């Protein structure tokens, strides 16, 4: 409500909540920090897990930051911004989601200290932007260049990513699967590797143990052969991929045929049968002995395919058809009549196998397949879900290193190096912006501090020790949470991709700056649900629900 010549002027609807200036900033910072604190205890190899129970009673137990934030139902807009940080980090780098969110939360905490000293948000924003830009330069400078073909380095990267997750006890196997899968689908363009992770399929099947998980150099499809008389195993398979139903096509118009005699009916049925037989005859003439169809297969067509000894699978997902094409070299045809021998793909074996009581189709032994499947096994659904999350992170970080050829020591070492160098940079910049740069540098120490805290170590003592040793022994010194002391992360093979760290700092600083720019929050009154009681805005932000 505003006033003009002593008369009140109503601008916003009744019930609207408005927070201006410091109130808006405090509430947004508080919401963002709550999100950061929620995931902070999951950071690092000694991080704890979260149990998430949805409205249907489904349970997820994980310490994966992206999964946790994706499953939590949030209402507060600033909290949702923090979730976007995690999503961006996951999309761009594949790992480091918790790191990005924790740094963003700490940057906002340190910004609040400056706001309390009456430093204007614009000055803090400028200082943070300068610090973030300088941090990117420093990371590029301290990064260690590696050979993308060096399997040992790739295995270390994958193992570091899996460490601390529930699947850690099988990290050697899972790291090996991740590296082999990425190397198989990687393609060189202009002398650099390009990896499309869409070409790696994760197929989960509860049963057996995690150690039974395997890499299939081809495609595994959760389908079965359509006809009992068809072969269940075909060697030297010539594979046809058809994006058309093997059925009699229905007319687009509502045409009607008047049949007045049994002969006409017989003739009509014979014509339908001939059309289906011609389709199958054409497939057989190309030399195909395995057919994958994206749509349906008529019962009669199934019968003729079985007579020819052709294995057929129907209603295959489009994504699986594309992977089959990349694995076998087959071309997807949209019209059976257009199918030629040149369109067929090859696999040494196509076989229907029973796993955990269900039939699955294995397409294996492809010549240099550019699509592969990681078959995940485990005792329960919870186990295989966690293994899948671990493998997803692992293949992403291996992709990062193969594409960029650069790594950093882990264990908080890069953050310590950045904190030291940004402190020096702040002295060069001078002015009030220097205070923001110093606070940015100090905020980065939250990563080594949290690693120590989650490992049950004395955080103050450990931070002093690790910074001192880092200055004396070099940038590889971080916190070894297993031995509870500073150690050279490079010597121990505890490394992470440069891309992960750069993106984490970029995402965190951008989110913090975006939240600091907000000085006015206008929250509309919640509408009443149909047939239920209203009640305005629930509590949490004085009218804005924290959603937790």
From Swiss-Prot:
Gene Ontology biological-process entries: protein folding
Protein origin, superkingdom: Archaea
Pfam families: Cpn60_TCP1
GO MF, one example: ATP-dependent protein folding chaperone
Biased composition (Gly residues): 531-548
UniProt keywords, alphabetically: ATP-binding, Chaperone, Nucleotide-binding
Keyword Transmembrane attributed: no
Gene3D superfamilies: GroEL, GroEL-like equatorial domain, TCP-1-like chaperonin intermediate domain
Region (Disordered): 527-548
Protein name, as recorded: Thermosome subunit alpha
Lineage: Archaea, Methanobacteriati, Methanobacteriota, Thermococci, Thermococcales
